[in-house]
């Protein structure tokens, strides 16, 4: 849902993409929170934020696009190592596709979490997306 207008995101908006070779460093990855074994659980909770860079947003007609992934895993990774592997694998997946869109980034992250990185229990996605009104 578009946060500014409250309208649902249409399929053409979600599938609108840009070739990967046209934009340098299209995505920013940050770990906003890493909870190590909270409440005596045997799993870590890692929150990763993926931001679209300015040039990519301009091409897609987006004002703001943050994708927040909350990941439950039984691994005990170092924060920087997890981020480096996650970032590399997502960009590798997108390079193989050749196009970057909102749906492709979500699909790439799910592929990495459930097929590449082992012992992922669950992933929860929240987003902050605002399309250009004008």
From Swiss-Prot:
The keyword Acyltransferase does not apply. Pfam families: Gemini_AL3 (PF01407). InterPro entries: Gemini_AL3 (IPR000657). Transmembrane segments: none annotated. Keywords: Host-virus interaction. The keyword Transmembrane does not apply. GO terms for biological process: viral process. Homooligomer. Interacts with the replication-associated protein (REP). Interacts with host proliferating cell nuclear antigen (PCNA). Interacts with host retinoblastoma-related protein 1 (RBR1), and may thereby deregulate the host cell cycle. Oligomerization and interaction with PCNA are necessary for optimal replication enhancement. Belongs to the geminiviridae replication enhancer protein family. Increases viral DNA accumulation. Enhances infectivity and symptom expression. This is Replication enhancer protein.
């Amino acid at each position: 849902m578009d946060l500014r207008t409250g309208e649902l995101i249409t399929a053409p908006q979600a599938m609108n993409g840009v070739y990967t070779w046209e934009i340098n460093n299209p995505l920013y990855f940050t770990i906003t929170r890493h909870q190590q074994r909270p409440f005596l659980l045997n799993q870590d909770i890692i929150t990763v934020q993926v931001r679209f860079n300015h040039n990519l947003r301009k091409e897609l007609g987006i004002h703001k696009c943050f994708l927040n992934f909350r990941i439950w895993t039984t691994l005990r990774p170092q924060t920087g190592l997890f981020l480096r592997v996650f970032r590399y694998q997502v960009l590798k997946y997108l390079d193989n596709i050749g196009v970057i869109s909102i749906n492709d980034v979500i699909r790439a992250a799910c592929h990495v979490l459930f097929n590449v990185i082992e012992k992922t229990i669950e992933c929860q996605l929240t987003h902050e997306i605002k399309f250009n009104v004008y």
